[in-house]
């Protein structure tokens, strides 16, 4: 069976693994997912990620990050633009999740960026997800 929204699947796996206090989570690999993982690592939401060879294709292994008392670094993660309803924003109307405490991942012509990077460059794009 084919997956309709592999990005939503990735975000759900991260949300569930974080809630269950798992150390790592595996998912099917794609460049887009690796770019999302790169942003999450750069912003401090995950420890690391690696691409591994599997029986069929590759898998993306994400190492989750927790605080000193076991508190989750990913409190919430939500898919915004979905296959049935795409959401776009101009550079002057980009969202600020939780008043700037979270990040919005934006797909632009320059690749995946956070809303802060989009504001600096003055570009808009498709709002992929919110993370806080």
UniProtKB/Swiss-Prot annotation:
User: What keywords tag this UniProt record?
Assistant: Ribonucleoprotein, Ribosomal protein, RNA-binding, rRNA-binding
Protein's UniProt keywords contain Ribonucleoprotein: yes
As one GO molecular function, the record gives: structural constituent of ribosome
InterPro entries reported for this sequence: Ribosomal_uS8, Ribosomal_uS8_sf
What positions belong to coiled-coil segments? none
Answer yes or no on keyword rRNA-binding. yes
Which biological process terms from the Gene Ontology are attached to this UniProt entry?
Answer: translation
Gene Ontology CC:
ribonucleoprotein complex; ribosome
Q: Which domain of life is it from?
A: Bacteria
| Protein family | Belongs to the universal ribosomal protein uS8 family.
Q: Which HAMAP family match?
A: Ribosomal_uS8_B
The entry's function note states: One of the primary rRNA binding proteins, it binds directly to 16S rRNA central domain where it helps coordinate assembly of the platform of the 30S subunit.
Q: How does it assemble?
A: Part of the 30S ribosomal subunit. Contacts proteins S5 and S12.
What is the name listed in the Swiss-Prot or TrEMBL entry for this protein?
Small ribosomal subunit protein uS8
**Organism encoding this protein:** Bifidobacterium longum (strain NCC 2705)
